[in-house]
Amino acid sequence: MTTVTESAVKALLTSETTASLRTRYEGSNICTWIGFKHINYLVEEAILYHFDQSGLAARTLHAEHGLGVDLVDLDTRILTALFMDEVVVAKVVPSAADGDDSISFTVTLHADRDGKDTKAITAKAKAVLRSDNYAEEAGEPPTPIARFVTHRLGTPAPRLPEAPDLSGIVPAADNTSLAAGRGTTGPDPVLDLLTAGKNAFGWKWRIPYPYCHFSERLQMSSYLRQMEEVVDLFLADRGISVKTLLDERRWIPACPHSRIQILDEALMEEELYTIYTVENIFKDFTYTSRMDCYVVRDGKLVQTATGKVTHGYALIENRRDWNLVTFDERVSKALRGEV
């Protein structure tokens, strides 16, 4: 068994790491630009590389010590677009003050722009080590890294409203059948409760195993997928689907900022209730929305994640160039729920 040494943990917490990473082909959905989800994937990949270079690779930690590396907070800003087949340089700076029970990371992605080193992406993240007793008992964690070990995922909750009481409400059980594919947006009594009186959209979906890791739980990258998916469904519900505005105007959603925090665990094959609420529209140029995710457990709503994402719209000028545009009345009304 690999020993978790003091020197390896010191490297994990104090050494900076630099890695060359390549954008993923899958992340290029419109022309050759890379979407926000795959930009976040690069940030995650850089952090995992840092673990590996410190001598504490994620596979080793799990296979030998029953510890799963989990990102529980990921806050990313896109300063300039990344492209298909682009190699970026990731710089990872870790930190952990005395008494911290998570490891913090600052990650920057640098790209070449006309021969100049350009900071394209900045991100802040937190990671913990989740003790895993699924296949066998994990045992006591190695002492040098024990303070970062948790028996359940979660971050200190931001100031969120308390989850509604489900008293008298029986969750629908027949609207996320396998034939339904993407689940349901209603009618559903729990979705109705969570969206009532808000400029919000609700989606209920059965968590499939490809969205999980370490055999049981939803992971950060899958919440990013969830965020991307609920935006797609929301826009279609408001009559301004991605394809509609592409075909009519060559407009595409453009995302400069996203953040997701995991508050509790969501498990494989649970029903996940995702609520997408438009909170602010800034000068008809960008809008910021909140994503809240819940499961129903023992008859109560349990919030498992919260996040925020900002979008604008970009006009595709040609296969290489785009420019941000102001919302017109149709789009503005759709986002405000005035359709």
Protein language model features and the residues they cover:
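Hot-dog-fold acyl-thioester-processing enzymes
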Residues: 2-71, 126-256, 314-339
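HotDog/MaoC-like acyl-thioester-processing domains
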Residues: 78-89, 93-179, 267-268, 278-339
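Hydrophobic beta-strand-centered segment that forms part of the acyl-chain substrate-binding groove
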Residues: 51-104, 237-281, 285, 306
